Amino acid sequence: AGVTLVRDAGDRYGINDAIRDEQRGGRVAVRSPGLGIKRPKRYGGFMARDIETGGDVAPVVAAMAATADDIKIILTGIIDFAAGDVKGAPQFDEDELRVMVETAHAHGRKTFAHCSGLAGLEVAVAAGVDSIEHGFFMTPSILDVMAEKQIAWVPTVSPVHFQWARPDLAGWDANTVGNLRRILDGHAEHIGLAHRKGVELVAGSDAGSPGVAHGVALVDEIFHFLDAGVAMAAALESATSRPRRLWGAASADVQVGNRADLLILDASPFDDENALRSVRLLGG
């Protein structure tokens, strides 16, 4: 599929750190947060550690920054597809999240937040996280703040799209399928709006979710951007130079002295977007 930069989003078993370390200097660069951060008895136990009180936040983030490439925060729950809404209130308030962000920045690390729903999105943008992952139930006003503060958005359309496209595998009824379609339509509308407002859109697939295959799902995500009205050049940037620039990866663009981390296709995607699925050569 041509993927040469992977940003993992948390793993309680440390496999992400191990793969990152094994791949150093190899073809694929892996960024790992190690464990994310969450509240006890809330969503995210498979990828995050618990923080009990606000007083624990700064020292925990400082300690994590010693080995983490980025700091992952589980700010909200997941979407209840049957109800058509996010489960529960935000796990952290604005003050707690701001301490995490400021501590991470003080240690040279960026933050990214698992977040959907208006309540969580308001906390995320107010605290100044560097990137919002998922961001379902987005609003135009939140996008305005994201554009102003240069907060990136990784919309991860693919997992929800799979749930809608294959309800037979998930056992969804007609009501839930309708909710999924409504969620996807709203998401696409706001992705297009984000593009027009100048929000830093980044293609990320949430690979490993049901029906979301590593590698090829990133190409699917580019197609979701195109379907939402994102121009081809911007959609390609969202999966190439932009994430490299935002996450601080080496060789973010084509310049003398940079690594030639190039994807060669059989044809130009500007002439035929399906050329994105026909990789001829991976350079670098």
Placement of each model-derived feature along the sequence:
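Short, well-ordered alpha-helical microsegments
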Residues: G14-D17, G120-L121, T139-L143
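Catalytic beta/alpha-barrel core
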Residues: F112-A113, D130-T139
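Glycine-enriched alpha-helix->loop->beta-strand junction motifs that scaffold or abut catalytic
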Residues: A126-S131, A147-W153, G171-A174, G198-E200
